[in-house]
């Protein structure tokens, strides 16, 4: 029995999504498979994707450049939210998934497809991100996930593909699964599945080993307008150029490497290796500029919801009502987050060592201990008495 007639398949050119093409046609009775690959700035990974899809049995192969919306509509809001999943992961992969889901739905509607398919397994987070985002954008469209059902091991998947002329792309000497876009890389599988094993240097593609980084620090200046990075070292530039250059600069100093045990949505712990040089530096710089321009209560409240925001993105709820509500709050907080931060890059560390803003709430005359001090020291005694009054009353009652 046919699962669908015409399917738009999220396509990467890898073995799993390539095998999906003959599998959908031969096992599930799909008549036409249209592949869609998103150009997210992953570079040469997309070379030959169109030809490979057509050779694997697709009737049409689409490659859509979405680098600019990835930066403007997904990365920049995440920077404004200081989004770090479990305080470490800048969400490079997770941010791309709702964007891919969006263009999949648009393509399905344009080509009259009755289903969308992806090659995610039943063990990872991406299946959730795709399914939930697609359902949010078009609840009527059917979602097919062959890899969730076919029950084939990695070796069996490769063998199935070879029956239909699909070559295995992963050599025994390089068993890693890699997801890359302009925001960063995610590396897993192979020996990395042992959390005790140090990742070999060969897995990294965006950052230098600390031993190979410069022996002198490099200082950079990042300009922000309303929480969005707009300049690097005094030169205004668009988001793509800025992140590309900052990836190179920060990566040269070994910044942005993350080795973590992360809690997946499906209930398991996973060892993940990430590289995200630019996003790491931008979030550190943005967070510091907020400390200069936001009031204490707004800062504390915003810090409290940043982890919630990160969890929503990680868990595939980009298009959820709560995410929309948090976006509205965050945008309001960014009205005055404009200024420049100076960052010292050295041996894997990005340290903010200077910040300035026309909206700065820092008052030298109030903060200084020098002769210019204008703080009313005498007012402190009354403030302390009132501030500590509840504790004083509690203590008196306790002592009887």
Swiss-Prot record:
The entry lists its GO molecular-function terms as:
argininosuccinate synthase activity; ATP binding
Query: Reaction(s) catalyzed by this protein?
Result: L-citrulline + L-aspartate + ATP = 2-(N(omega)-L-arginino)succinate + AMP + diphosphate + H(+)
Which residues bind L-citrulline per the record?
A: 89, 125, 129, 177, 262, 274
Q: Establish whether keyword Membrane is in the entry.
A: no
Instruction: Enumerate the residues binding ATP.
Output: 10-18, 38, 119
Residue positions annotated to bind L-aspartate are: 121, 125-126
Q: Where in the cell is it found?
A: Cytoplasm
The protein's annotated pathway: Amino-acid biosynthesis; L-arginine biosynthesis; L-arginine from L-ornithine and carbamoyl phosphate: step 2/3
What does the annotation say about its assembly with partners?
Homotetramer.
This chain belongs to which protein, by name? Argininosuccinate synthase
